[in-house]
């Protein structure tokens, strides 16, 4: 059996679908459906069972792995709101919870794949190579991810990791199944909906200078599957395309699909000043050295592919 935490979420549900494509459906989905709209993310994926995240505590997980043959855990569940200001909640949910899962996996030799984040690099002034000297988180969400990565790296250095553990530092992910994310959904999602509402696409002033590494969810799933199929490879890896493109390129891609669409530039919000990554670009040397050699979609290709899904199914897997 495989456990996917956050399995009703954006990345988690796509990972379940990716496992389905490998012929695997003996999956336990862990999530919280307090936001009931997330149930739509489960409609087109196959899994054996579901449990609420609040019930999936340390005691439950310990008992479950003692009574079931668990091959791997894809830990994608976390608070991903970069504007969350409750540091105690963030550290308990993202750091302590992940640490508990890690130690159960190490004890039982269960393979662990978990979601880290490119936000650990802060403003990126030192680059985006997987090295502690490059890491300087700008908010408490990023710090929670950074702190767990540091904890794991210490275990690696002490030779205390005796089973596969892979952390993937996701860059700016977009694609199907993110409808429930609200303000945290991708720029592509929001711009598409503005077009459909008859509005102009709204992007921040200076967006042509804001360069991000935008990665389509299908590429994220492909990287996860690569490590799942290569159990001898462990470590923390960047998961981006290796190319930085501007927010304007997203708008241009949508404009190629919706010819009448236009852009409106809006003021940059004060609430984001000093907490906003203006530039991200994954360094892929470590990922490529691990053997992942597939190409990544650029913004133009990926956004058009996403727009097709948004048009046909409202943004859900088909």
Curated annotation (Swiss-Prot):
GO terms for molecular function: ADP-glyceromanno-heptose 6-epimerase activity; NADP binding. Binds 1 NADP(+) per subunit. The active site is at 141 (proton acceptor), 181 (proton acceptor). It catalyses: ADP-D-glycero-beta-D-manno-heptose = ADP-L-glycero-beta-D-manno-heptose. It holds the Pfam family Epimerase. It comes from the Bacteria. Catalyzes the interconversion between ADP-D-glycero-beta-D-manno-heptose and ADP-L-glycero-beta-D-manno-heptose via an epimerization at carbon 6 of the heptose. Homopentamer. This is ADP-L-glycero-D-manno-heptose-6-epimerase. It comes from Brachyspira hyodysenteriae (strain ATCC 49526 / WA1).
